[in-house]
Amino acid sequence: MPQSKQQFKRQGARQRDSKGKFVKARTGMATAPPAAVSTAAPTASTMTPTGSSTTATIGGATTGASTTTAVTGCGCNCCSH
């Protein structure tokens, strides 16, 4: 039993919400962050991870910045702040 609790705590510590902040595993709270990340994943996949500056539409807003930074949330400054 203690081993399974440690594994659950490790998984909970790694979870992040859509803004990239760590989320503690709670009942009800644990199901919300993955849903937010899954909705942001398609927009992140459409953006090219390479250093080429491309205009990607994220929630209707167009950004022409190069996507060389680490992808957190949607991978642009609109989500990190």
Curated annotation (Swiss-Prot):
Higher taxonomy: Eukaryota, Metazoa, Ecdysozoa, Nematoda, Chromadorea
Name under which the protein is recorded: Uncharacterized protein K12H4.6
Region feature Disordered, mapped onto this chain: 1-58
UniProt biased composition (Low complexity): 30-58
